[in-house]
Design a protein with these regions (language model features):
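A residue-level structural signal marking coil residues immediately N-terminal to beta-strands
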Residues: 1-2, 33
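Catalytic Walker B motif of ABC-type/P-loop ATPase nucleotide-binding domains
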Residues: 4-8
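ABC ATPase nucleotide-binding domain "signature" loop
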Residues: 11-13, 44
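Helix N-cap at the start of a conserved alpha-helix in ABC-type nucleotide-binding domains
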Residues: 15-17
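Conserved mid-core alpha-helix of short-chain dehydrogenase/reductase
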Residues: 20
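ABC transporter nucleotide-binding domain
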Residues: 23-108
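Short, charged/small-residue-rich alpha-helical element at the C-terminal edge
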Residues: 76-146
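ABC-family P-loop ATPase nucleotide-binding domain
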Residues: 149-151
Length: 151
């Protein structure tokens, strides 16, 4: 068929079958098939969808081309992997903590300049992060912002 509907296509699949199904999905997309997918796994949506609609309680909260949506947010996130506690220093530079993990930190930044100043201070204090990446927010983060804003 030219049009395929998938409802939570990866739900309940183990990693091996997930990879098998991803291969099938890629083949279908490569063959020019149109796929309408409902999913709560935003990483899957990012991987396979060009256009999207995010619904909350039956109402559209975001729709459009995925690249354009993400581009409209800009590079507002900072990922830092570091073995040192850098949170107080980050907060003193106006960075807002989104998440602390075993491997590092995720911050929201107002500008590249604030991230640059933060990095300069880290280096001046002889703190050298393994990773320092300014990036656009993930679709998962955008979903949380949009759906959380309408609840």
């Amino acid at each position: 068929p030219e049009l395929i509907f998938l409802d939570e296509p990866f739900s309940g699949l183990d990693p091996i079958n997930t990879d098998v199904f991803k291969g099938v999905l890629s083949e279908l997309i490569g063959a020019g098939k149109y796929i309408v997918m409902s999913s709560h796994q935003m990483s899957t949506v990012e991987e396979y969808c060009r256009d999207l609609v995010i619904l909350n309680r039956g109402k559209t909260v975001l729709q459009g081309n995925l690249r354009q949506i993400k581009a409209s947010y800009g590079h507002t996130n900072l990922s830092v992997s570091c073995g040192t506690d850098i949170l107080p220093l980050a907060e003193s530079h106006g960075l807002r903590l989104l998440e602390k993990t075993a491997g590092g930190y995720e911050f929201k930044i107002d500008s590249d300049a604030s991230a640059q100043a933060f990095l300069e201070e880290l280096v001046a204090r002889r703190i050298f992060p393994e990773r320092f990446e300014i990036r656009e927010p993930s679709l998962h983060e955008i979903f949380i912002e949009k759906v959380g804003a309408t609840d």
